[in-house]
Structures are given as C-alpha cells and as structure tokens.
Amino acid sequence: MFLLGVIVAIIALDQWSKWAIRTSLDLHNKKIIIENFLEFYHIENPGMAFGLSFPGGSQLLLIMTVLLTVFILGMLWKERNSHPLMRYGLSLIFSGAIGNLTDRIIFGKVTDFIHVMIGEHFSWYIFNVADSSVTIGMVLFLLYSIFVENKIKKTKTDND
C-alpha cells in the first residue's frame, strides 16, 4: 500500500510541476534558480529521452510507451513480494512512465524544464520529475541486479 502512495505522489508531483511550468513560463523561456547551476527552461519534447527522435514517429512512440508501461506494471505485480530495491525501482520507473505517458496522450509531447549545468562549460539535457523518477528507479533496479540478485544466485548455487 505504501508503494501505491509513492507512485501516486510522484505522478502528482510530476503533473503539478509540468502544469506550473506550462502556466507560468512561456515556451523556450527560462527562470534562473541558481546562477550557472540550475534553471527552469520550458521546452516541449515530441521525441524520446535526451531529445532523440523516434524512427516510427509520434504514434509509434506512443504505442511503444504504452506497451512498455504495461510491461513494467506486470513486472511490478510479479515482483510485489520481492526485495525492496526491486519493488521501489520498478515503482519509480512505473511512476515516471505514467507521468510522461500522460503528457504524450494529452499534449502529444512531454514538458521538460529542469536544466542542470556546471558553470558555462557543462550542461545536462533538460528533463522533468518523471525522467528523474525513471533514472532513480533504474539505479535501484541495477543495484538490485548487481548486488542482491547475484547474491541470491550464488546462495542457490552453493546450496545445490
């Protein structure tokens, strides 16, 4: 039940933050939060992560996103009693997927606005709360795969 609350909270924060940007900052405008480190820069991304275009166009991207989201939901259900790293990782990935899928369904593109840089020499891609959720979820999933799953496999092998 706690994970459901986490999922709902992340989706709500993602959608609220995108709404706040769309209603307070014109497209391609920015608001500096911390000089040379963090700004909100309003862009709309019709493609995939990092501004990459999808070879099959926006309709195919939408279909693929729906299918992947359903797959993640299935994994989350299957792993509902597994290790917390797995459950939290999948929950964060699912939350981010739903957040960006909502944008694609309603607007046909995703609102991105968080821009991190280090001085004038390093600038990261512009992203949103949903992207952050997916990234953190992937890190947790990888930590599970590297440390926990390998330990479980080793224990099973030692017991056989």
Please state what every model-predicted region is.
Residues 1-160:
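Alpha-helical transmembrane bundles and membrane-interface segments of multipass inner-membrane proteins
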